[in-house]
Each structure stands twice: as structure tokens, then as C-alpha cells.
Swiss-Prot record:
BP term (GO), one: cobalamin biosynthetic process
Entry GO MF terms: ABC-type vitamin B12 transporter activity; catalytic activity
Lineage of source species: Bacteria, Pseudomonadati, Pseudomonadota, Gammaproteobacteria, Pseudomonadales
Organism: Pseudomonas entomophila (strain L48)
Positions of transmembrane segments: none
Identification of the protein by name: Cobyric acid synthase
Length: 487
């Protein structure tokens, strides 16, 4: 049983992508491999079959391994709910919310959960492919580290270091990171991968030769800059658009400070008939066919921000002119009369007025609802599947006209009497081809195409594995993974 870890010189260096690529590449070799990330800080999450919660990137990596997502793949998940605090999720379950100082002390306990999960995976799979977090050279975070070299030292595993050349300074990033590690940590780094290179590789070769001579470590390969790869982002919002045709539906997503699960909108971003725009602070909401209020980790605080930015008035104007409006999860809660947080789960205890567009109110409760679900969309009776991640319980007459009839007998969400507003707790609403097409037709795109988003994701995973074959030193990678060429 082998554990191999990918660490990066910075955030967004390409760790998640490389782990996904290596997982599918190993699977092609006939090797049973499992993804693992000790600690993830992200507001994009997925629900496992047993009702736990892990980072979205690990769910994609599980797909690359053709495995069902499991809480052991990401034993510690931190979901920021303020500038200094986060909800701490261990083995898929919310433990508590902590500020940074309290969590630093808690990491001793968190490390026990990390090592227990890793050991279970190590016993079950020949290769555990691990993703680090941020950079291993953050001096202020090195004490008690459980996400990078602290974990690698604890389980005695080799490390690949990846850096993004597109942002500039790649040699400084690699050499500087290495210099800031301890001698034993430096010895763990078995090679470098340079990511997002564009241009003539021959012009880069002198730098690669210098890097190998300077560090005594091999460059395992140079991955090209890929412009049309569309796997879910771990945390940053991906604003890239697929090429659109002439007839498009204009969709606006207001970006609030604690937006969560914005990967909900990836299928729309890729849809050839949708012009998706994320609107940030200081930007007015332009005319659109559809506005979507996304999920939020701090609904009341984000409601306040929405009003401060004048977006509540823009939404009211949008509805007066006949536009359509969707609220997903936290967005659903914002559309009601009130949001109550008596326990202070998302900040100071109290209540906030919602937008009052649907006749219900929400109370935030300590027990989070986590489940994968399927059912029938009220629009066109289209099949729909997705997942719930929410602490709120919503009650009121507005729910008498549900958005979704779930297969387990429950109703979800609401559709307004005039048919302009749809609210749902379901994430992943647009991933199903039939449900996505039905929603786009409802929003005004009469000839909406059905796009197989799952097939697009699978295609991209295969492309990543191709890049490993074409651009990395696969023989050295096999050695690091402890597998033979004919495995």
C-alpha cells in the first residue's frame, strides 16, 4: 500500500486537477486508487451516500477513481462563516464553529481523525492519492500542520510539488518553497510538476535544467495551459464561458460574501444557450431573463449585504418586468418573510427580515440536513436529482405549491402563484439534462437544449489522464506509486 501526496507552492497551483488526473491515469493502469485530502477549507461541498459532507473536489476525484464519495476521503472540512471563523466538519458531521485561534488548538484532535481515515483507506486500496492545501511553506501555519508536510511526515509519504507558471515566478515559487521546508521535509519532495505552460517548451528547457541542478530533484513534467477544461472549482468562482450561439438566455447570479456551492452554476456556464454572469460588489444587476440567488453559509449577513448593495430593489424591478427568479438553499431562505437564528449558528443570534416574496419563514437548527435526493420537478414533471446541505427548517403556506416532489414522499421548496419564482433546497439542480432544460424553458428559452453535464465531466477527467500520459514522466510516477507498468 502506497501513499503519494501532491502539494502546491500556492493556492490554485493545480493540486486538485493533478490529483484528479493521476487518479484516472492509475485507474487506467488497473490500479485501485482512492483520493484523500486531510483538511479542506471550502464552501463547495458534496454529500456522501451515508449523509456526510466532504469537499466538492474530492467528490470529483472519487469519480475519477470510479468510487462513490466517502467521508474518509476528506475527514476535516472547514466552511468559513466569517472572516475569522469557520464551521468545523469532521468525518462528514458538523462539530462546531470556531475562530482561527480555537481551531489551532483543536488541530491535535483533528489530526487523529485525519490519521484514522487515512489508515482505513490505506488498508482498503493499493494507492492513496493525497491532495495538500494551500502551500506547505506558510510559516505561521506550520506548527501543528495537518494539511501538508505535517501529514506527510506523520504517514511517511513522498511528495510531488506543483507550481503554476502562468502567474509568473515559477522558479522562485519552487525553490523558495523548498528552502522554507525542514531537511526531512525537503527529502520528501521527489520531484516537481510545472502547470499551465503556454509556448515553446524548448524555451523553458534551460530553466528546467537549472532547477534540477539547483535542487537535485527531477522535473516530472510540464503540463500545458488548458482553456476548455471545466471541472468544478474547489472554491474560487470560475467565470469562464463556453462559446455561445446567437440565441441565449441571460442569467444573473449575485455574488454575496458567503456564497456556497457555486458549482451549482457550472452546467449553466457551459450551456451553449446561456449567458451566465456573476455580479459582484459595486455592480448593478443588469436586465436579465433569470436571476438566481445562490446558497449562503451566512444567510442573515448576506441578506444585509444584498440590501446594502441595492440588489433587493433590482430583484423587485426584475419581477415587475416579468423576469424569473430562483432561490437555492440559502437563496430559498432569503425569499421568505423571516430567517431566525436563535442559536447563533451563523453569527450573532437573532432574526432578519427576508425579501418577503414567498409566504414562509425559516428557523436555523443545530442539526444539518444532509442527503442525496431524487424526484420530479414541478415544471414539466421533469426528473431531477441533487443533494441537500442546510441547517434551516422552513414552514409556511407558500410551500403548498412545491418546486419538487421527492421520491421519499417529501415536498421541496415552492413555486409562486404567478409562476415567476421558484425556490428549492436542492443543489445540483441544473446537472440533470432534463431538469436543466425544463428550467431554461420556464425562464424563457423555448428551444432549450438538453446538455449531458455528467458526460462533459467524464470527458474532462479522461482528458486529464491523457495529459499525464503525454506530458509527465510516467515511469517515475509508477515508481512513486509503487506500481509496475503492467499493473
Amino acid at each position: 500500500m502506497t501513499t503519494l501526496m501532491v502539494q502546491g507552492t500556492t493556492s490554485d497551483a493545480g493540486k486538485s486537477t493533478l490529483v484528479t488526473a493521476l487518479c484516472r491515469w492509475l485507474l487506467r493502469q488497473g490500479v485501485a486508487v482512492v483520493p484523500f485530502k486531510p483538511q479542506n477549507m471550502a464552501l463547495n461541498s458534496a454529500v456522501t451516500a451515508d449523509g456526510g459532507e466532504i469537499g466538492r473536489a474530492q467528490a470529483v476525484q472519487a469519480q475519477a477513481c470510479r468510487l462513490a464519495p466517502h467521508t474518509d476521503m476528506n475527514p476535516v472540512l472547514l466552511k468559513p462563516n466569517s472572516d475569522t471563523g469557520a464551521q468545523v466538519i469532521v468525518h462528514g458531521r458538523a462539530v462546531t464553529s470556531m475562530n482561527a485561534v480555537a481551531y489551532h488548538d483543536y488541530k491535535v484532535i483533528a489530526m487523529q481523525a485525519v490519521l484514522a481515515s487515512h489508515e482505513r483507506l490505506r488498508q482498503a486500496y493499493p494507492v492513496v492519492m493525497v491532495e495538500g492545501a494551500g502551500s506547505p511553506a506558510e510559516i505561521n501555519l506550520r506548527a501543528g500542520d495537518i494539511a501538508n508536510m505535517g501529514f506527510a511526515e506523520a504517514v511517511d509519504c513522498p511528495v510531488i510539488l506543483i507550481a503554476d507558471i502562468n502567474r509568473g515566478g515559477v522558479f522562485a515559487h519552487l525553490v523558495g518553497t523548498l528552502e522554507l521546508l525542514s531537511p526531512s521535509e525537503q527529502a520528501r519532495v521527489k520531484g516537481f510538476v510545472i502547470n499551465r505552460f503556454r509556448g515553446d517548451i524548448a524555451l523553458l528547457q534551460p530553466g528546467l535544467d537549472w532547477l534540477e541542478q539547483r535542487t537535485g530533484k527531477p522535473v516530472l513534467g510540464v503540463l500545458p495551459y488548458v482553456t476548455d477544461l471545466h471541472l468544478e472549482a474547489e472554491d474560487a468562482i470560475d467565470v469562464r464561458q463556453a462559446v455561445k450561439g446567437e440565441r441565449v438566455l441571460k442569467v444573473i447570479v449575485p455574488v454575496l460574501p458567503r456564497i456556497s456551492n457555486h458549482t451549482d452554476f457550472d452546467p449553466l456556464r457551459l450551456h451553449p444557450q446561456v449567458d451566465l454572469q456573476f455580479i459582484g460588489p459595486g455592480q448593478p444587476i443588469p436586465p436579465a431573463d433569470l436571476i438566481i440567488l445562490p446558497g449562503s453559509k451566512s444567510v442573515r449577513a448576506d441578506l444585509s449585504q444584498l440590501r446594502e448593495r441595492g440588489w433587493d430593489s433590482a430583484i423587485a424591478r426584475h419581477l415587475r418586468y416579468g423576469g424569473k427568479l430562483i432561490g437555492i438553499c440559502g437563496g430559498l431562505q432569503m425569499l421568505g418573510h423571516e430567517v431566525h437564528d436563535p442559536l447563533g449558528l451563523e453569527g450573532a443570534a437573532g432574526s432578519s427580515a427576508g425579501l418577503g416574496l414567498l409566504d414562509y419563514s425559516t428557523v436555523l437548527e443545530a442539526e444539518k440536513q444532509l442527503r442525496n435526493v431524487a424526484g420530479t420537478l414541478g415544471l414539466e414533471q421533469a426528473p431531477v436529482s441533487g443533494y441537500e446541505i442546510h441547517a434551516g427548517v422552513t414552514h409556511g403556506p407558500g410551500l403548498e405549491h412545491p418546486a419538487v416532489q421527492l421520491d421519499d414522499g417529501r415536498n421541496d421548496g415552492a413555486i409562486s402563484a404567478d409562476g415567476q419564482i421558484l425556490a428549492t433546497y436542492l443543489h445540483g439542480l441544473f446537472e440533470g439534462s432534463q431538469s436543466c432544460a425544463a428550467l431554461l424553458r420556464w425562464a424563457g428559452l423555448a428551444d432549450a437544449q438538453a446538455i449531458d453535464y455528467e458526460a462533459l465531466r467524464e470527458r474532462d477527467i479522461e482528458r486529464l489522464a491523457d495529459l499525464v500520459e503525454q506530458h509527465l514522466d510516467t515511469e517515475r510516477l509508477r515508481q512513486l506509486c509503487g506500481v509496475t507498468a503492467d499493473a
